[in-house]
Amino acid sequence: RIYPVLKENVRFCVEGVVGTAQGYAMSPATSPENDFLFGEEKKEKLTVAQYTENENAIVRNLLRDYLEAGRILGIRDELTGQAEKIFEEMAAPAVGSNGQILEWNEDFEEADPHHRHLSQLYELHPGRGITEKTPELYEAARTSLLRRGDAGTGWSLAWKILMWARMKDGVHTGKLMNEILHLVEPKESMNMANGGG
């Protein structure tokens, strides 16, 4: 029952990707809430890039699931061939100058290096493209998690817990599980750092 839904989503993505120097990508794209610094003096904040790892990761995982479902169901058609080509030639996750997974198509300086969003790590969680079987990306994901830090709202901490669990770091996972249970005072109207939101 899910295959027709996958197929229509894949059809949309196949028609939406464009060729870039690094491979196929959804373009242009933004990364949730975080900006990058641009210009000679790095004072200009921009949000739109040629592509983002987050959007590409979502497409990669969709294509991966669609192709796997087709193999299981014994379905192969013209769209299957297009999906295979795009999947094989998608812009891959890249590692930046600080050893982190790049959020955008270039190694732009983040406006907020400690931003609570980790959308560039979609292939770590909930995706399945960054694992111990991809050691360079796996370590770059760890570096990204450490660079962003542990602070965040409840939902952000939940994502970090799941990502640290995928890194098989029980100590860090446990630390964040304790943090997510941190009491947020009801008088506070907004608390973005200690499990609130």
Model segments located where?
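Acidic/histidine-rich catalytic neighborhood
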Residues: 8-69
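Active-site core of glycosidic bond-cleaving carbohydrate-active enzymes
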Residues: 1-4, 53-197
